[in-house]
Amino acid sequence: MAENNENISKNVDVRPKTSRSRSADRKDGYVWSGKKLSWSKKSESYSDAETVNGIEKTEVSLRNQERKHSCSSIELDLDHSCGHRFLGRSLKQKLQDAVGQCFPIKNCSSRHSSGLPSKRKIHISELMLDKCPFPPRSDLAFRWHFIKRHTAPINSKSDEWVSTDLSQTELRDGQLKRRNMEENINCFSHTNVQPCVITTDNALCREGPMTGSVMNLVSNNSIEDSDMDSDDEILTLCTSSRKRNKPKWDLDDEILQLETPPKYHTQIDYVHCLVPDLLQINNNPCYWGVMDKYAAEALLEGKPEGTFLLRDSAQEDYLFSVSFRRYSRSLHARIEQWNHNFSFDAHDPCVFHSPDITGLLEHYKDPSACMFFEPLLSTPLIRTFPFSLQHICRTVICNCTTYDGIDALPIPSSMKLYLKEYHYKSKVRVLRIDAPEQQC
């Protein structure tokens, strides 16, 4: 009995709770290991102790399995809680995410990005504005005013800076703006302003806010020199953009006089004439009167080659047009007038022309006399309706009188305007007046 008691006393852990391991504490938390041995059980045999130890070993194995299942359930819970975030991710990334939930890791990129200066640049469209788009007393506002005041206009012809004449009021405004600019420059302690005057072969740059002086910013901050664009590059970009977008009114007066041709005032005398064969046109069955090209295309749809009709032109400068079928589609051609002759191209002397419109239509009826680019008028499309009596009376009256003779008729003025509707203008004389004197 004494030996058994000594063995049991050796197995009892006499260390304090603070010095015990975590495994010992966990053993105390379970049922079988947490029960204290009473003095009555100390007298049990050694075989009973061995059975107890065997039972404890089986319990330890069961507890290890429970821990494994609990860990796997935790991983499943993490997968369900994170949703699609863990899909397609490696085990290492999952572990890093799980550790990051317990011990948040600082983002290095945000720490470095907060310390660096802003890389905001001034766009060319912002430099073209009349008012500063940036908040006052900001770095971008200072740069905007700096570029606007110290960049001279560019001559697009010589690609050099040209001096401009300023009035007294503009000079005063420029001096005031320059003083304000110097005061604003003193507010920035990290920059030094060094003026630099640039001269060219043709013109010297004058002093003032709108001259060819370039201001170079010398920065004392190494971070700003490395990360942000220098002011010299901004000025170069601005001057090149102004060279491309320079308006004509910025050029010098002498250059404008040399480049622009002299202007002359001309007086053109016209003679008004009525259509000579208006009655024959009205009696022609291919004449359809007032009609646009869309209605003509609808009438000519599906017709054979050479089918045509004569109609009034939709343009005020022309009287008549022909619509015809050629190359399996509907085409249109205006009848032009020049020197009392009618043709389809008045500017080409090789094109056939006729003193009346009916003769022009008769010429293009023959396919052998028609070129490939000229209208083919072989088959007329017959009109399906008669003209009004008023229109027929107008054609008969115009066939018996002239344009100036209509004014002598004893009829109302509205009737005279109606009779003069089908007429054309022909140039008689072109007189050049107010010609500038030739300079010796």
Curated annotation (Swiss-Prot):
Induction: Up-regulated by EGF. Residues 1-10 have a biased composition (Polar residues). InterPro entries: SH2, SH2_dom_sf, SOCS4/SOCS5_dom, SOCS4_SH2, SOCS4_SOCS, SOCS_box, SOCS_box-like_dom_sf. Pathway: Protein modification; protein ubiquitination. It comes from the Eukaryota. Residues 286-381 form the SH2 domain. GO terms for biological process: cytokine-mediated signaling pathway; intracellular signal transduction; negative regulation of epidermal growth factor-activated receptor activity; positive regulation of proteasomal ubiquitin-dependent protein catabolic process; protein ubiquitination. Residues 376-425 form the SOCS box domain. Residues 1-29 are annotated as: Disordered. Residues 12-29 have a biased composition (Basic and acidic residues). Keywords: Growth regulation, SH2 domain, Signal transduction inhibitor, Ubl conjugation pathway. The SOCS box domain mediates the interaction with the Elongin BC complex, an adapter module in different E3 ubiquitin ligase complexes. SOCS family proteins form part of a classical negative feedback system that regulates cytokine signal transduction. Substrate-recognition component of a SCF-like ECS (Elongin BC-CUL2/5-SOCS-box protein) E3 ubiquitin-protein ligase complex which mediates the ubiquitination and subsequent proteasomal degradation of target proteins. Inhibits EGF signaling by mediating the degradation of the Tyr-phosphorylated EGF receptor/EGFR. This is Suppressor of cytokine signaling 4. It comes from Homo sapiens (Human).
